[in-house]
Every structure is written in structure tokens, then in C-alpha cells.
Amino acid sequence: MSDLTHNDIQPYQAHPELVRALGRVAVFMGGDSAEREVSLKSGKAVLAALQSAGIDAVGRDIQGCLLRTVDEPDFDRVFIALHGRGGEDGTLQAILGQAGIPYTGSEVLASALAMDKLRTKYVFEGCGLPTPAFRAMTSVGEAEGIVAALGTPLSVKPAHEGSSIGIRKVNSAAELAEAYEAAARLDDLVLVEQWIEGPEFTVSLLQDKALPAIGLSTDHAFYDYDAKYLADDTRYRIPCGLAPDDELRLQHLALDAFRVLGCRTWGRVDIMQDRAGEFWLLEVNTVPGMTDHSLVPMAAKAAGISFEELVVRILRDTLAEGIDA
């Protein structure tokens, strides 16, 4: 595991004028999705960092009806640390937007697109960006035909879950049918795509710039939920191990993916490299994890940006254009 920590960079304090301009900030965390526990960890880390930087910030554990979050708000803007359905799929963004409350991250359409892995791939494909061949699967009876069309191994995933929840690797039509049934219990829409054999990379994006890429390796079959948040044997490579030209190509691809979906301010793009050296887009995360295992803070640190500065820079983009603070 990487020995990067948030504490190796000098303490960061937001400028007093910026603190005044931001007003009171509510960090929304928790939620009712399958990623609730991860979101609570992210939200608590973000809240502590904002407070450490001098921002007037409070935490809000969001559960139940999202419409209630804007009833008589006692805050000026929201830092969204909700992962998964409700908080990352455009729903909360629409509610806050209608209420006139500024919020961090991507707007409604980009959030909804990025949360839908199948439609994200349609956009990538339509824009000529490389993404593994795929099919939408709606019944067990399609397993034989999908294997005939795509070959094996394959990745099976619920189309609207994050944090690698529900993802399986399969090597036959029988395994695909079983994996489909498991994924369908989590989501009405199931995505099947060709499995790319090779190293995995992730590129974090901040204010339309790519941070240093991170190479990922794990003793698990792939970078799954346990490897992301629980395991101590996950290895992070910073520098990522690619030649400089290849890392630049990787970063440009990540920026292209972020832009074609219309995302803003910050996010993370997951990419595979095959044995021939070609890169393949997997997905875009518009509210990535911000825990002690999370990748965006690691990439920021490699760029000389402390965790406190990172969250303040994300938050600063909620200010109206023309405000110089």
C-alpha cells in the first residue's frame, strides 16, 4: 500500500475573504444507497478538512426524502459527499438547483449520465472514445448470445451502482447467467462488457486539469469494493509506472471522457490498459470517494495539494462567476 498521507504537506488555511464569500457550508453525506458507509467516511473526512481550513462547515447525514434537505436551510451551499443513487445521479443536484442552493461537482445531466454506466458507454462510443465492447443484458436467456458476440472473460455489473458493488468476472455463459441474476437483484439494468486483461489506472481531475495518474494493483481478482475500501494489500503506484508520453495520453483520454459527459470541477476516470498498450475507458465518477483509502486525495497530494486545499478548491467553484475571493 502507498504510504501517502494527508499530513505531509504544510497546513492550508483558506483566505478570510474566501471564507466570508462561501458562508456556511453543509457537507451532505450518508444517504440511503448501497454506498452509505463509504459516504459517511468521505463526508466526515471532508468536513474535518473544511473546518481545519477555516471554513464554517457542518455535517448532514442525509436519509429519507431528499426534498426535505432544502426545507428552511441553515446553510449557504452544499459540498456533496453522497455516493451512489440519490446523491450522485442528478436527483439531489436537481433539488438543490431548483432551490437555488449552490453545490459542488457536476450538474444534473452530467451526474445522471455518469451514474448510468450503460449510457456513459453509448456516449463514449458515439464520440469515438475507446471503451470495451458491451451489451445491455435484460434476461438470463441472453447469456449464450452475449458470450458468442463478446467472447470471454466478461465483466458483469449493475448499471447504476458505484464502488464496484455487484461486479463479477465470468468465463462462461453459465457463469454469466448466474452473475446476471445477482446483478439484477441490485439494478433493473445490467451491463456486460469485455474484460480487459492488463493494468488498471485512475486519473483524478480538478478544475479541468488532470492530476498525476495512479496505477492500481491488488491480490483480489480485480479492484473491487473490498480492495477499494477495506483491504490493506492494495497497492497504489505514484508515479503510475507509465512512460511520460503514455501518462500524458492517459490524462488526455480522461479529460476527454470527463468533458464529453459535461462534468465539472472534479471527478475521477477509471481506465484499463490492454497487453498491446492501448487504453480503454471504464467509467467516470462524479463524486469519488474521499476516505483514507481514496484515490483523489492521493493524486492531489502527489501534485502538492493538501487534503484541506483540495476540498476548498472544489468548494470554491460553487461561487458565482466574477467573485474574486
UniProtKB/Swiss-Prot annotation:
Which InterPro entries does the record match to this protein? ATP-grasp, ATP_grasp_subdomain_1, D-Ala_lig_Van_CS, D_ala_D_ala, Dala_Dala_lig_C, Dala_Dala_lig_N, PreATP-grasp_dom_sf
Quote the subcellular location field of this record.
Cytoplasm
Q: Name one GO biological process term.
A: peptidoglycan biosynthetic process
Per the entry, the cofactor note is: Binds 2 magnesium or manganese ions per subunit.
Pfam families per record: Dala_Dala_lig_C, Dala_Dala_lig_N
Q: Where does Mg(2+) 2 bind?
A: 283, 285
Q: What does UniProt give as GO cellular component?
A: cytosol
- Which PANTHER family does the annotation name? D-ALANINE--D-ALANINE LIGASE, D-ALANINE--D-ALANINE LIGASE B
**Which protein are we looking at?**
D-alanine--D-alanine ligase
Which organism is the protein's source?
Marinobacter nauticus (strain ATCC 700491 / DSM 11845 / VT8) (Marinobacter aquaeolei)
> Which gene underlies this protein?
ddl
